[in-house]
Structures are given as C-alpha cells and as structure tokens.
Amino acid sequence: MNIFEMLRIDERLRLKIYKDTEGYYTIGIGHLLTKSPSLNAAKSELDKAIGRNCNGVITKDEAEKLFNQDVDAAVRGILRNAKLKPVYDSLDAVRRCALINMVFQMGETGVAGFTNSLRMLQQKRWDEAAVNLAKSIWYNQTPNRAKRVITTFRTGTWDAYKNL
C-alpha cells in the first residue's frame, strides 16, 4: 500500500465530471475542477487542465496525470506550510500518507486548522489524536474515509485499507 493506492480507495476513479460530497465539480481521482456551481465553468477548467475539448469526459491516462499532479501538490503544500511540515517530519511513512490524504481532500489550509489534533500527532499521542479527529466536521462529512484515515494515524498500519 502507498499514498496512491490509499487515495484510489478513498476517491475512486471517475472519468466523467461529477459532484463530490460537498457539491463541487470533480473528475478523475478526486481532482477538484471548481467550486463554481456552473457545469460550463467546470468543463472549461477541465479543458484547460487537459489541453483539449473534453466535453466533461477524460481518459484513464488523463485522470492519472491529474492525480499525480494533485498528490505532488498536496505534498508540496505540506512541506511549505509552517504548521504541517513539523508534524509531517515527525511521522513515520504510513502516517505521513494519512496526512497527505487529509491535505488531498481538504487542502493544506483546511488541515492546518486541526491545531490540537496536529499537536497530538506530533507528540505521538495517537489515541488522543484519533478521538479528537473523530469530533471534527470532516469526520461527519465523510465518516467512512475519516475512520480509515484516523485508524491509519492511530495504528501506523494499513489495516483500515485491507480488503477494500
């Protein structure tokens, strides 16, 4: 298991524009196109991102390219963020993937707002961090994914992603 496999489970591949859990137009493996309510705006963003007229549909290869760019952007966001980088640096490889997963979903600014949980993670207080993360709006909005990510933080294993 790695971050790419983890996110493929949590995001799934969709080759046609869809609305995510927050109602935002998305495509591929969790690639946010726009927060605009306009489907035409989403199609325009997609055409720019891919470099051709897509009419709201992309190939698997195009989805993979966007996905790789998005994972790279999430990691870069963590490394440049003064609140996230020290936490990331303190984590083992599996737990780093859990943090990348959160940033992929919510953005670096969103995750940086988890001040208490981040402090607990940096201090390796896994059980307390898990309890705290489960009290979040994020947990209520995407409970299945949040449970898997939280279990990954708590255990430092891929157990939550086995057999999925």
Swiss-Prot record:
One of its GO terms (biological process) is viral release from host cell by cytolysis. It is an enzyme of class 3 (hydrolase). Its EC number is 3.2.1.17. One of its GO terms (molecular function) is lysozyme activity. GO terms for cellular component: host cell cytoplasm. It catalyses: Hydrolysis of (1->4)-beta-linkages between N-acetylmuramic acid and N-acetyl-D-glucosamine residues in a peptidoglycan and between N-acetyl-D-glucosamine residues in chitodextrins. This is Endolysin.
